[in-house]
Amino acid sequence: MNKKSFNKRSRLLFKHFTRKNYALFNCLGREVLIGMLSVSTLSNAKANGICVKTELTGDSLQRKEVRLDEVIVSGSRAPLAALQSPVIVEVITREDIQRAEASSVNDILKLATGVDVRQRGGFGVQTDISINGGTFDQITILLNGTNISNPQTGHNASDFPVSVNDIERIEILEGASSRILGNAAFNGAINIVTKQSYPSASGSSTPQLSSYIELEGGSYGTLTAGAGTNVLAGNFSNYLSGGYTRSDGGTENSDFEKGRIFYKGGWNDNRQNRFRLDYQLGASTQSYGANTFYSAKYNNQYEKTEHLMASLGGTVNLGTDDRGIQLKPAIYYNHFNDHYQLIRHEEGAAKGENYHWLDILGASFNANINWLMGKSSIGADISKETIWSTAYGADQPEETWKEIKGTERRLSRKASRTNTNLFAEHNILLRHWTISAGLLYYINNLDEGKTAEKAAVTHHHTSTLSPGLDISYRPTQSWKICLSWNKAVRTPTYTDLYTSNVAQQGDPSLKPEENSMFKISALYKTNRAEFTVSSFYSHGRNMIDWVYETEESRRYHALNIGKLDNMGVSLNSKLQLHEDAKSAFPFQPMTVRLGYSYIHQSHKTDQPIYRSLYALEYLRHKLTVQLDQHIWNRLSLSWSVRWQQRMNGFHPYWKIDGKLQWKAENLTLYLKGDNLTAHRYYDIGAVKQPGLWIMAGGIFQIRLKR
């Protein structure tokens, strides 16, 4: 599908052998379509002759890059391949991840031009992730298409139960995406897709097993251990991984411990491909010294978070690919625990200690219909959020309070929300065009239950409509031009509504944020090069931020700060300079990636604002350069250089990372360095980042087939 066609040939449908002397001449200059082959003919055909064989070598630099044109990406409600998608979805591949100096998912996202990663701690501890000048509460995080975002606060959205070794690819959808993924995708979405192999169509019951073990250690007493295994047996696939990381931290009061476990399973009917089940279960926990994470006045903060997630989904295919219906029901569950101490080891509400328990139970259904006029999709996603807390929500009757293990304190406050997302979308697929139009009808019900002051239910109801239109034009298979307009609405988080302490004050009367975004982008792609340019304009109303209203303010207040317009442009390029590492000269560049983004912001408000904590501290400039080099034989070197300038008083900085890697068939050894120049820099407020951080380790792989 990647070859260009200049002279369209006439087609001849082959059904059987005529055994005539002139038959072969009828085929000259014509495209022959094989309509029927007998069983005896197929039995004499070798697999090597009818399929493309891909040889996997030990060094990832020696593997030819697989084009992603036919990978289904999250750019629309209906399942569309990247080539047909009406938008450009940035995809970070497994090869990109393996070469990067990355210890966490957050480190990988730093290399994406349109993504802003504001790090408080190392190895993905407490990281704010945003897209296109937005804030950390304005994106949706998905794991294999399941929403794992935290509606309490986006600060904890990066508590992933997976490691970089578990990931097949990461999809980044920039811009307002509510009509595709729900109201939380206010400014974009990130979908993490994990590794998993499905049983072959032959239905062989021969078990297959592949496993890995990883150990690494380095600066500041950092130690990581992890393992994973993938088992195929009959119609079932199973992937299980786990890991543990600990460190003394690179700065004062930044020590941490992290643990995770993840399982993903699947079942399909092999030959028929009519039905498939996917199920996953994951858990992560981390405890860390929070330094000055939330207030520069307190440098001895502490936090512990826990995340449990589970989902079960099915895919039912009825009819044919051209004229058929695909049904996708799913249920999912997320549980979050958050224990925060303003002063480490100091307990009690008066000392700023709080506990939060959050449960999210949801169900979704999507129907994709392929018919004469295109691909239509209708669906719904309904979820119930319930938070019990010592600080968030309304006071509850004492007999309903929840016990907290290990302390005499109890969860005495509660709030719950029911989120209903109703979707409709239609896609028109033409030879050179894809036109996708859709809308989201969102209903939010906030219920504070029977409060302690009155035996009544405090109830708030809002509903909004978010339409959108995406158009792509493909003049050739190398070019793609996209134009889109989408609206989105986001409800405040529980932190926005209810926080009340010596450093912050929320506001229960906050209005939902509104956003309207226009975007135009272009992609040029060949086997050796890829170039992307895009520009966007977003118009936001009732935007939420934490601010000092006057110079005398001592607490940040959650506030609707008025209108906020973001205008930006980004450029990305990737050049494959040399395909075969075996024939390359020592230190010869193999792949070069270059990215740059620029954002200008315009703010209008009637509210007095002295200082902004998040929304006005956007990245104006971001430049990324990545270089992969072949050194000798199985030895390779990868560099990453990043320069960025943040507004609202931050100094611009350069950061250089590197990874030296030796890779054999079953063993990988590496040495990686973060912040090689030991540059002093800040991503958030007064939270100082570590200097030079060196890690060394290895990954051992086992592959068995019985």
Residue ranges and their predicted role:
Residues 49-98, 106, 136:
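Short, acidic, small-residue-rich periplasmic hinge/interaction motif at the N-terminus
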Residues 106, 110-146, 150:
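Extracytoplasmic beta-strand/coil segments of soluble accessory domains associated
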Residues 128, 147-176, 193, 263:
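Short acidic/polar hinge/loop motifs at secondary-structure boundaries
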Residues 162-212, 224, 581-585:
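A beta-strand signature from Gram-negative outer-membrane beta-barrel systems
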Residues 219-246, 251-286, 301-326, 333, ...:
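Transmembrane beta-barrel wall of Gram-negative outer-membrane proteins
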Residues 292-320, 356-358, 411-417, 457-474, ...:
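Outer-membrane beta-barrel signature, preferentially recognizing the C-terminal barrel domain
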Residues 377-476:
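Signature of Gram-negative outer-membrane beta-barrel scaffolds
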Residues 429-435, 444, 536-539, 557-645, ...:
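Gram-negative outer-membrane beta-barrel transporters
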